[in-house]
UniProtKB/Swiss-Prot annotation:
Biased composition regions of type Polar residues, renumbered to the chain: 578-594
Taxonomy, superkingdom: Eukaryota
Reported function: Cholesterol transporter that mediates non-vesicular transport of cholesterol from the plasma membrane (PM) to the endoplasmic reticulum (ER). Contains unique domains for binding cholesterol and the PM, thereby serving as a molecular bridge for the transfer of cholesterol from the PM to the ER. Plays a crucial role in cholesterol homeostasis and has the unique ability to localize to the PM based on the level of membrane cholesterol.
Main location: endoplasmic reticulum
Recorded topology in the membrane: Single-pass membrane protein
Annotated signal sequence range: none
Species name: Mus musculus
GO biological process entries: autophagy; cellular response to cholesterol
The name this protein goes by in its record: Protein Aster-A
Alphabetic keyword roster: Autophagy, Cell membrane, Cytoplasmic vesicle, Endoplasmic reticulum, Lipid transport, Lipid-binding, Membrane, Phosphoprotein, Transmembrane, Transmembrane helix, Transport
Amino acid sequence: MFDTTPHSGRSSPSSSPSLRKRLQLLPPIRPPPASEPEPGTMVEKGSDSSSEKSGVSGTLSTQSLGSRNFIRNSKKMQSWYSMLCPTYKQRNEDFRKLFSKLPEAERLIVDYSCALQREILLQGRLYLSENWICFYSNIFRWETTISIQLKEVTCLKKEKTAKLIPNAIQICTESEKHFFTSFGARDRCFLLIFRLWQNALLEKTLSPRELWHLVHQCYGSELGLTSEDEDYVCPLQLNGLGSPKEVGDVIALSDISPSGAADHSQEPSPVGSRRGRVTPNLSRASSDADHGAEEDKEEQTDGLDASSSQTVTPVAEPLSSEPTPPDGPTSSLGPLDLLSREELLTDTSNSSSSTGEEGDLAALLPDLSGRLLINSVFHMGAERLQQMLFSDSPFLQGFLQQRKFTDVTLSPWSSDSKCHQRRVLTYTIPISNQLGPKSASVVETQTLFRRGPQAGGCVVDSEVLTQGIPYQDYFYTAHRYCILGLARNKARLRVSSEIRYRKQPWSLVKSLIEKNSWSGIEDYFHHLDRELAKAEKLSLEEGGKDTRGLLSGLRRRKRPLSWRGHRDGPQHPDPDPCTQTSMHTSGSLSSRFSEPSVDQGPGAGIPSALVLISIVLIVLIALNALLFYRLWSLERTAHTFESWHSLALAKGKFPQTATEWAEILALQKHFHSVEVHKWRQILRASVELLDEMKFSLEKLHQGITVPDPPLDTQPQPDDSFP
């Protein structure tokens, strides 16, 4: 709940990410009236107990009793919720209270739950700041506090608990060794400690923008900041949640030269330049491989060894010459930029380019680092392809109906500039998950870039936020549509996607998110590619052209749907900050459960293994049918014989005279006597066998019986009377 009193003590700065997140879902920005406050004024963030005690006595007198009770209940809910899920500000205050001897300039960057191994395991939390590593544990009032300056660290090593579980980190100084275990995200913590340690050895300090960028990547966009936090600096990129208008004021696509952008995209980041000098002096010792953990991907981004055990020692000789970071938006992330995505930018050297415009756009805005889903050439103009995909066209309406999207609302493109436009879409997607909701609302934001007003090609970045699905506040997906005009009636469509995280989930949750999200993304864009191909075919048929000849000459090249490797190219952030604000509907977690709306053609893309399995299943079905027929035949034969026997008995003649009955009785007596004689023989044989067994048991008993000891045979003297 939000308190709208103008003198609240919990007012966040104008650049706070919580304000930007609330303004994200509003309609397109309009010029504010003269009565609205300036951008530098404070905006209310939440209600607090102090907000009702300072300068609001006049306002409280006009409020109703029910309103005040509602606010009081909301405060109670916030109190216990803050205890269970403390904000970054609360964690930072706890950090300063626990480690009061540290310099006041030290600010918490991230904290992890872990345990210190001594005589017993001391469960606590590990706190990381720019220059210190701190640990605090409190077990039944037994407090343990450790503070290690990063410059004093001599060795940083990954370890295994009990030589089996890869969840430990060992930090060594000249005098002590500290063994921390029970990490939930060991590799990510090791990577951040290593980068902070590397920065301390190089005597590099973080700028406020770089520090807050790291804080946002570790704790998300909601930090719980107030107006008292004057040192807050909003980074340029908040994992794609920044305002496109605000980022567009920093960088305009039309002002970037193709050559400069291409050179800038290939220039290594400050982290890469320093790592290139530090890594040759590092001694690495890997014990045994541990490639099963999900966090090992983050370890590979740093160019380190991918094994589960890794030792890093500091540089023996000082590094005197260091290149200064380049100026510009790409250097604002600084040497400790932990990108929200785990992959690097896609290398666009393999993409074919027929015109200079395609090369310019590819150099300015390369593919996203996730997966390339569509890379096709269509025999239609770039303008027409853009109208089909990004306007209220019959093609888009039919496609959304096939995907069973409802409550579709398309806002018009903002007309500020033809080179930089933006619009917001809202709709509802179906979900076939039986345990979850049946539908989910989606808010999609699309940002369009052009090289010029008359340019045929364009780039559209989209981002989507799906509400009402599991872990909706942890991630979102980004998509980039690149439409390149190759000729008058020929254009290329490239669509790349990636999953971006606002918070860092557990490895199990992360794998679940990626599995379900990529399944929905691939299904959506494969469907879109097929529908575009159908529309192209209809267009060619209406034009009276030879469809077969033209379609056979179409050059279609699709890349395999695989993750980009970390070492395919230089490690550098996206040159355009607006690319962090892209998203699409199919990338949500619920898209995996959406009903498929279009059936594929017969024999389209059927692998050989599926054909073999189908043949085996057909053979098994035939064998089962044959076995069923045999069993049915045997049962029918048995019933036939039984009916014949009963029929024969029914047609037989019964005895009529006394002589015939006497013969039957004599036969019966004879049969009875034979049976009695047989049973007597069986009983006699049984008795004989029992006698033999009894005799054998008696002999066995005599053989194992121990003889009694001999009695004393000496004669006893007789008592005689004299």
